[in-house]
A protein has these predicted regions:
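Residue-level signal for well-ordered alpha-helical positions
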Residues: 16-17, 48, 85, 121
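Active-site neighborhoods of divalent-metal-dependent phosphate/nucleic-acid chemistry enzymes
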Residues: 57, 69-111, 120-123
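Short glycine/serine/threonine-enriched helix-capping/active-site loop
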Residues: 37-38, 74
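A generic structural signal for short hydrophobic patches within well-formed alpha-helices
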Residues: 10, 42, 79, 115-116
Length: 123
């Protein structure tokens, strides 16, 4: 299964894996799954770090690769979906992850209940 992980799932997987449910940890560890960290997540982390909302002392691209995660670029097809998406969720980064999920037909691993209001699968 191909899965996009939300930003908080990425951070928890790296630093606080016990915050993840057993099912989520199992899915992340299952070698038959391809787990994606979006370039949107990388941008979100860097922007939050630059304005002092988050302290990051690691390179998230390198850490994603070291952890066995693949990177998923935000593409034009996903960007075009943003125009028609309802504003159930106001966070622009989450909206872009939702658009990627819809464009690629990959589920999103998240604890954010607002994401389930969109026509994407949530795990």
């Amino acid at each position: 299964m191909n899965v996009i992980i939300d930003t908080h799932i990425f951070l928890w997987a790296l630093a606080e894996p016990l915050k993840l449910s057993d099912a989520k940890r199992s899915a992340l560890e299952d070698l038959s799954n391809r787990i994606y960290v979006s370039t949107v997540t990388i941008a979100e982390l860097m922007i939050k770090a630059s304005v002092g909302k988050l302290q990051i002392d690691f390179n998230p691209v390198a850490k994603a690769k070291e952890s066995g995660f693949a990177l998923l670029d935000f593409n034009p097809e996903a960007a075009l979906l943003l125009k028609e998406m309802p504003f159930f969720h106001k966070d622009p980064f989450d909206r872009m992850l939702i658009a990627q999920s819809i464009a690629h037909n990959y589920p999103i691993m998240t604890e954010d209940s607002k994401i389930s209001l969109y026509p994407c699968r949530v795990v």
